[in-house]
Structures are given as structure tokens and as C-alpha cells.
């Protein structure tokens, strides 16, 4: 974008012969069209954070020149944080793999909106089997996820192949600040629920416990991270 603006400014500031000017105008128009196409195909969002940017990775059949289009998702400001506020993450991982090898494969960023039996429903309205698509990850309402799916040509339907968290982080020695029944909070920043939390056998988090956790990005009330695994370090 900055390069295109610089070229436009330079074009209007200098004098050129008519032939060069015509060629330059054509080149600038092509660049601008390419940029608009890239933004139009790749960018998009859902209001109220109900779902994340749709189709931020384009499929192999949408291309400009020889290179497939790629773009980073336009995340809400609260979600762009690399780790929970005020905490130092040991690692923060973007759980994005390389482009799917099959041309019919798609990548969708969305949020989990409801859990019904063994099927989950996301912001774009299709369900998937927890056992088949989620592997070691157990999604929860509000989790931001990346869904890899294929279009069934014979049925015109979508089949989810893999569901994983959009981003996760590892944090050491964080404190349980409060608990309320089956839910609780770490460092007043990270939400957790015993309904979807991996714990050592026999351990139940209590206030002031010091723990190591793995957290995923999740849109909960007042919180943007959810603990999915917890190991006690110091129990009071």
C-alpha cells in the first residue's frame, strides 16, 4: 500500500512524455486493481466479535499471477494481544499450518457458538463431530478456532476435517485468583471452567494455588483467554 501511494505521488510530481505517462498510469491501475481484489477476496469480518475474519487464507483456485493470495486476519484489538495482559507467556503459538495441499480445501476462522451433543456449531452455521475433527482439543463456547474443511461437490455441503484453537500460549506459575463453582479465574485475566479443563487426577483448583497453564484465545465475558490445561506448582 505505501509503495503504491509513493508511486502515485511521484507520478503526479514529475513530468514525463505521453507514452511513458500512459504506461505508468496503466501499471498503477493494475496494481490498484490487484490490491482491491486481494482485499475483497481475503478480508471480511462479522460484527460484535461473533466470528473471526472469514477466508483469510484463500484457496488455490483464487490467484493473482502465479502466487496464491494470502493475508493476515483482521483481528479485534483485544484479540491481537500476544499473551494475557500483564502476564509473560513462555511461548505463544499461532496454530496456522501451511496452506492445505488439496485445491478443494478451505480454511475458516470462526468462533464456537453452541455445543449440542457431540456436534459443535460455529458462527458460520455448520456442525462437526468432536471426536473426528477436534482430536486433543475440546472446544468451548466462545473459543476462537481455525476450521479446515472441504466442500462436498456431490452434496454442496461442508465437511469439517480439523478444528484447532486460533492461538494458544503457555504460562508458568500463575495464581488462581478466584473460583465460583465449576468456573474460576487466573490472575484476574484467564477464565477457566472445570467442564473443559485438563487437570491431574484428583486436583481441583483453589484460590491462591500457583499453576502452569495452557490457554487459548476465547471470547468470554470480560476475558479473552481460556485455560484448557492446568498443572499445580504450589498448593496452599
From Swiss-Prot:
Consequences of knocking out this gene: Knockout mice do not exhibit any gross abnormalities and survive to adulthood. Homozygous females are fertile, while the numbers of both litters and pups progressively decrease in hemizygous males over time. Males are totally infertile around 32 weeks of age.
Tissue-wise expression: Expressed in spermatozoa (at protein level).
Subcellular location: Cytoplasm; Cytoplasmic vesicle, Secretory vesicle, Acrosome; Cell projection, Cilium, Flagellum
Alphabetical GO biological process terms: spermatogenesis
Any one GO CC term of the record: acrosomal vesicle
Coiled coil, from the record: none
Cysteines paired by S-S bonds: none
Main location: cytoplasm
Keywords: Cell projection, Cilium, Cytoplasm, Cytoplasmic vesicle, Developmental protein, Flagellum
Keyword Cell wall biogenesis/degradation attached: no
Domain of life: Eukaryota
The UniProt record lists the keyword Cytoplasm: yes
Region (Disordered): 57-84
Role noted for this protein: Plays a role in spermatogenesis, possibly acting in the regulation of the autophagy pathway.
Subunit structure: Interacts with GABARAP; this interaction may be important for GABARAP protein stability. Interacts with LAMP2; this interaction may be important for LAMP2 protein stability.
The protein's name: Cancer/testis antigen 55
Species annotation: Mus musculus (Mouse)
Gene responsible for this protein: Ct55
Amino acid at each position: 500500500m505505501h509503495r503504491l501511494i509513493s508511486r502515485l505521488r511521484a507520478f503526479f510530481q514529475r513530468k514525463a512524455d505521453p507514452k511513458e505517462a500512459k504506461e505508468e498510469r496503466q501499471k498503477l491501475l493494475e496494481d490498484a486493481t490487484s490490491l482491491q481484489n486481494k482485499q475483497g477476496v481475503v478480508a471480511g469480518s462479522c460484527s460484535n466479535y461473533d466470528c473471526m475474519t472469514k477466508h483469510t487464507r484463500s484457496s488455490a483456485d483464487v490467484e493473482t499471477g502465479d502466487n496464491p493470495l494470502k493475508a493476515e486476519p483482521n483481528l479485534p484489538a483485544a484479540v491481537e494481544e500476544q499473551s494475557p495482559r500483564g502476564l509473560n507467556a513462555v511461548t505463544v503459538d499461532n496454530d496456522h499450518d501451511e496452506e492445505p495441499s488439496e485445491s478443494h480445501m478451505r480454511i475458516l476462522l470462526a468462533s464456537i457458538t453452541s455445543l449440542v451433543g457431540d456436534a459443535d456449531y460455529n458462527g458460520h452455521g455448520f456442525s462437526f463431530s468432536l471426536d473426528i475433527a477436534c482430536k486433543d482439543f475440546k472446544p468451548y463456547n466462545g473459543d476462537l478456532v481455525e476450521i479446515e474443511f472441504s466442500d462436498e461437490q456431490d452434496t454442496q455441503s461442508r465437511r469439517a476435517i480439523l478444528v484447532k484453537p486460533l492461538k494458544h500460549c503457555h504460562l508458568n506459575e500463575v495464581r488462581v485468583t478466584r473460583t465460583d463453582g465449576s468456573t474460576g479465574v487466573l490472575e484476574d485475566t484467564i477464565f477457566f471452567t472445570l467442564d473443559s479443563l485438563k487437570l491431574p487426577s484428583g486436583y481441583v483448583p483453589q484460590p491462591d494455588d500457583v499453576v502452569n497453564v495452557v490457554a487459548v484465545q476465547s471470547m468470554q465475558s470480560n476475558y479473552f483467554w481460556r485455560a484448557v490445561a492446568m498443572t499445580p506448582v504450589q498448593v496452599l
